[in-house]
């Protein structure tokens, strides 16, 4: 199927999508652990990397703000289902800080289906490339050395890919007066790519929803519309990438409650 086939606006090259992922398990000689947040845009191939000792949800938020201030806002930001991106999994109706950031900037968060291949292929390929071109090519004595070499690589890569980046779908300008308010009630749309179970149901936001009993073990795209207070489920088929039939619409209301920083509260 074409690039971004599961999102019609991306597949038609009308919209850009940034994919994010974390590389874990790296250790500098001497014992310093390193994790890397990586980003790549689907059409432009615009890359960025943020090596750190540990990647927290707040690390991701600050990196996205920095990246989008510099290069503009995509229409979509795609992640896997790691709690750093999605928010805590143990509570119902949890909207994490990264999702709140995206929604506040008019960027639609997209979550890849668990245990499915292909959806994060671009950023996973970049993960491997970063390790080959940066991590495995040089000897590092400190995290600062890793960060400096990674920044050099990203800059050189963006210069080489300039024509492709310029030809990609337009990115919106970052709003000058914007300020992140984690306590604001989230508004906008969140997209979850999921596979139904044997009964045609999917689990989202701590709830189980009937999609279509005639659509078992199949891929769907769930649009959680927080303004319309509904979820629309669309059928997805790799063999028919332009076919996105609406399967079901269900009511959904996100409760209004205070955003709690789980990491900070657990450290108190």
Regions found by a protein language model. Name each.
Residues 77-80, 88-132, 143-147, 151:
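RNase H-like two-metal-ion nuclease catalytic core shared by retroviral integrases
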Residues 16-47, 57-59:
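An active-site-proximal beta-strand-loop segment
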Residues 21, 39, 45, 64, ...:
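Mobile genetic element proteins and their domesticated derivatives, centered on retroelements
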Residues 154-268:
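C-terminal, beta-rich DNA-binding module of retroviral/retroelements integrases
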Residues 58-62, 122, 241-248:
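A short, polar/proline- and glycine-enriched secondary-structure boundary/capping micro-motif
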Residues 1-17, 170-175:
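Basic, flexible linker segments flanking DNA-binding modules
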Residues 30-31, 81, 206, 237:
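Residue-level detection of beta-strand-connecting loop/turn positions
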Residues 32, 49-76, 251-254:
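Active-site beta-loop-alpha junctions of metal-dependent nucleic acid enzymes
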């Amino acid at each position: 199927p074409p690039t971004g086939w599961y999102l019609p606006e991306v597949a038609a090259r009308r919209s850009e999508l940034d994919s994010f992922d974390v590389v874990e398990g790296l250790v500098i000689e001497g014992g310093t652990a390193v994790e890397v947040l990586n980003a790549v845009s689907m059409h432009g191939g615009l890359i960025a990397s943020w090596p750190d000792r540990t990647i927290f949800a707040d690390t991701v938020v600050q990196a996205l703000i920095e990246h989008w201030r510099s290069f503009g806002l995509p229409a979509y930001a795609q992640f896997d289902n790691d709690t750093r991106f999605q928010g805590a999994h143990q509570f119902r109706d949890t909207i994490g800080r990264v999702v709140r950031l995206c929604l506040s900037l008019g960027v639609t968060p997209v979550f890849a289906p668990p245990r499915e291949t292909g959806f994060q292929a671009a950023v996973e390929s970049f993960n491997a490339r970063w390790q080959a071109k940066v991590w495995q090519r040089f000897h590092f004595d400190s995290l600062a050395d890793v960060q400096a070499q990674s920044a050099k690589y990203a800059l050189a890569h963006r210069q080489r890919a300039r024509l492709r980046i310029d030809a990609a779908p337009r990115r919106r300008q970052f709003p000058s007066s914007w300020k992140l308010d984690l306590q604001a009630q989230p508004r906008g749309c969140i997209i979850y790519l999921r596979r139904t179970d044997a009964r045609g149901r999917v689990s989202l936001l701590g709830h189980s929803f009937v999609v279509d009993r005639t659509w078992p073990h199949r891929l769907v795209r769930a649009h959680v519309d927080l303004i319309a207070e509904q979820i629309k489920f669309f059928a997805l088929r790799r063999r028919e990438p332009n076919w996105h039939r609406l399967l079901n619409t269900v009511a959904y209301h996100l409760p209004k409650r205070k955003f709690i920083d789980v990491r900070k509260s657990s450290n108190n």
